[in-house]
From Swiss-Prot:
This is Large ribosomal subunit protein eL29y. Residues 15-31 have a biased composition (Basic residues). One of its GO terms (molecular function) is structural constituent of ribosome. One of its GO terms (cellular component) is ribosome. Belongs to the eukaryotic ribosomal protein eL29 family. GO terms for biological process: translation. Residues 1-61 are annotated as: Disordered. The keyword Ribonucleoprotein applies. Keywords: Ribonucleoprotein, Ribosomal protein. It comes from Arabidopsis thaliana (Mouse-ear cress).
Length: 61
């Protein structure tokens, strides 16, 4: 008896495009769970010290 076929990609592309291949929805705040703690700590400091130039203009005078 002949061996049976194990795999084929036939019709898979058509099935995927039937409802359209969509990009994942972008959220305003992406979850940080499981991310590198060193990177997250640096992000926190960067966010804390991210000051626009116009906000502290009156302090120097």
């Amino acid at each position: 008896m002949a061996k049976s076929k194990n795999h084929t990609a036939h019709n898979q592309s058509a099935k995927a495009h039937k409802n359209g291949i969509k990009k994942p929805r972008r959220h305003r705040h992406t979850p940080t769970r499981g991310m590198d703690p060193k990177f997250l700590r640096n992000q926190r400091y960067a966010r804390k010290h991210n000051v626009k130039s116009g906000e502290n203009a009156g302090v120097e005078e």
